[in-house]
Amino acid sequence: MKPNKLRECLDSNQPSIGTHIHSSWPSLIEVVGYTGMFDYVEFVAEYAPFDLYSLDNLCRATELQGLSSMIKIDQEPRRFLAERAIGAGFQSVLFADGRTVEDFHECVRAVKPETPEDGGVHGVGVRRISYM
């Protein structure tokens, strides 16, 4: 598993610095990485046009720059997009527009493995992250 700088900062109670991007252009992440100023990049998919191939390329760019990755997804189809984003290599998923406690429980189930211990619904997918 790739190092997750954002998770490391959170676990050690340290501040982190990230930036938001609304473009699926991976070269933008390269520019952000070359500044050396950020721990993570958040792709705001809720407001940005993208295709599923773009998710793979955005994650490749963050990995090459040593950045953590986060994706903010819209309320629907949140489970599908969360599974595809994790499969592409995103390390964090930010769910937008939850309205009820059950909405947020479903969000957590969407990103947890489908095992008796974890209680999630995220199955094994043959995606980019599974063959790395």
Regions found by a protein language model. Give the residues of each.
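Glycine-rich, proline-tolerant flexible connector loops at the mouths of alpha/beta enzymes
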Residues: L28-N57
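Hydrophobic faces of well-ordered beta-strands that scaffold small-molecule active sites
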Residues: P15-I21, V41-F43, S69-I73, V93-F95
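Alpha-helix-loop-beta-strand connector modules within alpha/beta enzyme cores
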Residues: L52-R79, E83-R84, V111-D118
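N-terminal amphipathic alpha-helix/helix-capping segment at the start of soluble metabolic enzymes
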Residues: M1-H20
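Glycine-enriched alpha-helix->loop->beta-strand junction motifs that scaffold or abut catalytic
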Residues: T35-Y40, G87-S92, K112
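Conserved anion-binding
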Residues: F90-M132
